[in-house]
Every structure is written in structure tokens, then in C-alpha cells.
């Protein structure tokens, strides 16, 4: 199994907690490789994370993406969000071609069950599996041309990278971001929803529980 994160040095404690939660609940049938897109993670913190993952008999690979904005090819206004949020759109750019499926997790997520449950989901021919986000209002849906469509949360993604590459999803997403620079509330999440709306497999809400969802109860 391949798990992907995009984090900077400030998010290392949260990433460590996430990795611990993944392996603590994993059945162990399949090996896990943790792929970390690193934007400035120090050598000391990389070493500590590597030692921790090795103790769990799993694998960890770092990718230096400190120059990831060069791959974007344009300047982008994230409206106050950390610029690294856009890096997940470049997953096919940085990950090896032999990786055909990947789970993306926000670094501050905690996994409470076996991650294999998500890994083995049937995407039904879609490019990406995402969990619906119930807190988005009509005005934002209209702005993204999503009337009549579900809006989805990008904190957890199950991606068919083979299809992502063959259908040029990255180019489409980056083109959309460039055209909407500074006018997307949730940046990459909005882009994923707007561009891939017909290619998203809606996953069960049990696979992603957010504080926003808790507040709505």
C-alpha cells in the first residue's frame, strides 16, 4: 500500500501521530510505504521519522519538493493558506510511474481503523475516491459550477494514478487553478471538485470524520 502526505517541518509531530495511528490499526497483511512530500523537513526530523517507521517494519520515502512551485508554472494566491496545499495536485509529477494507486492523507488526520479498508475500495471506474463534505453552501457550489453535484473533502483521497496520468488530470487541475488564482476558498479542494466532478467516486462518510461534521450534529 502507498500512502502520501504533503507537509512542512511544522507538521512533523502531526505526521508522526498519523503514521503511528496507521500502523497501530493495520492488519499487517500488506506492507505500507509512506511517501512524504517534504517542504523543508529538517534532516533530524527526517531521521526520527525514518527510525520510527523502521521500528514498525514499514517503509518511508521522502521527496524534496521545496521547489514545487516551479512545477506549477505560475504564481498562485492561496488566500492565506499554506502554499503546500497545492502540492497534492502534483502527486503524479513526483511519485514514480510504477505507483498506480495511492491514498493521500492530510498530515493531521488520525486513522482509527485498518487503512486497508480504504485501500481496497472499488472506485467503479472513477479517477479518485473522496468523501462528501456536507458543510458547503449553494453559493460556493454555484461558483464552482457544481449545481446538482456533491462537493467532496480532499483530506482523504484514494487515487487511481494510472488513470490520473492517462487522462491528464494534473494539467487540467493546474490550468483551473491558474485561471481561478486567489478566487478559490479551498484552493486544491475546490479545484479537485470542479475539474473532476464527473470522475469522483463518493466514499462512505465513515471513512472521514471531521470536526465540522461533529459541530453539525
Task: For every predicted segment, state its role.
Residues 56-90:
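Active-site-proximal specificity loops/subdomain of glycosyltransferases
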Residues 113-138:
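Conserved donor-nucleotide/metal-binding helix-loop-beta segment in metal-dependent transferases, i.e.
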Residues 164-183, 201-203:
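Catalytic core of tubulin tyrosine ligase-like
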Residues 209-217:
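Single conserved hydrophobic/aromatic residue that forms the stacking wall/gate
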Amino acid at each position: 500500500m502507498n500512502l502520501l502526505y504533503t507537509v512542512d517541518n511544522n507538521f512533523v509531530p502531526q505526521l508522526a501521530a498519523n503514521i503511528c495511528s496507521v500502523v497501530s490499526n493495520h492488519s499487517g497483511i500488506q506492507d505500507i510505504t509512506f511517501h512524504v512530500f517534504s517542504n523543508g523537513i529538517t534532516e533530524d526530523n527526517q531521521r526520527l521519522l525514518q527510525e520510527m517507521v523502521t521500528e514498525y517494519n514499514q517503509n518511508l520515502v521522502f521527496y524534496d519538493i521545496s521547489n514545487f512551485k516551479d512545477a506549477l508554472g505560475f504564481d498562485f494566491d492561496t488566500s492565506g493558506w499554506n502554499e503546500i496545499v497545492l502540492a497534492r495536485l502534483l502527486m503524479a509529477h513526483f511519485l514514480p510511474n510504477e505507483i498506480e494507486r495511492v491514498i493521500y492523507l492530510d498530515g493531521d488526520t488520525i486513522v482509527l481503523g485498518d487503512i486497508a479498508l480504504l485501500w481496497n475500495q472499488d472506485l467503479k471506474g472513477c479517477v479518485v475516491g473522496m468523501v462528501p463534505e456536507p458543510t458547503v453552501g449553494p453559493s460556493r457550489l454555484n461558483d464552482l459550477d457544481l449545481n446538482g453535484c456533491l462537493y467532496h473533502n480532499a483530506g482523504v483521497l484514494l487515487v487511481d494514478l494510472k488513470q490520473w496520468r492517462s487522462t491528464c488530470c494534473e494539467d487540467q487541475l493546474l490550468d483551473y487553478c491558474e485561471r481561478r488564482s486567489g478566487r478559490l476558498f479551498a484552493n486544491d479542494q475546490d479545484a479537485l471538485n470542479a475539474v473532476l466532478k464527473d470522475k469522483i467516486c463518493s466514499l462512505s462518510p465513515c471513512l472521514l470524520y471531521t470536526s465540522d461534521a461533529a459541530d453539525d450534529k
